[in-house]
Amino acid sequence: AIPSRSDYSMTDEEFDKLIPVEFWREVVDTVAQRAPDTLLLAEAFWMMEGYFVRTLGMHRVYNSAFMNMLKREENAKYRETITNVLDFDPQILKRFVNFMNNPDEDTAIAQFGEGDKYFGTCAMMATLPGLPMLGHGQIEGFREKYGMEYAKAKFDEIPNGHVVYRHEQEIFPILHHRWMFSEVESFALYTLHNGYGFDEDVFAYSNGIGSERALFLFNNRDKHTRG
């Protein structure tokens, strides 16, 4: 028979007595002392990204909320996520690694399509503070899901010329200007008022450095809006 977990569990008080210091906080502090040039990159449970950088002190954290919320068009929730970070400490935005797919998920094209929704989300990833991360085969528009155990591709895919072209025309020029978007001192998030209330489906923000400024607008829903 396989013993259940409850047979070997302990109360919170017992656990805190045996392990009084948070394990990962201790790791971060130890690494800072012994290997100060080490970059600590965390994969956090969904919606715990802020905790990993605020409390545990990780240098970077994979921001799965970006992919999941924008894919599901939970735009109000993601706007709230950004707002909460800005209210607490805007510098935390710089620690997020934003992405549209990873080896555990379907490819970016499979999740976002190959049209305006994909390229709007990709442009948003390229213009938010933090680190934009493009997945394997994303620029080529590949649809095969690559697991970490893959030694080579199983599908004989060829690059999607339309997808590659739009990356070259719309995304690469933005990435060449990452210096305008990577900091948070001039980052400002706006709310669109459409005459009836706030349109939470529209992401509007500006950023820049020195005398250079950029305004980003993205309507992440298949509808018309104005404001």
Regions found by a protein language model. Name each.
Residues 1-227:
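Active-site and adjacent substrate-binding regions of carbohydrate-active enzymes
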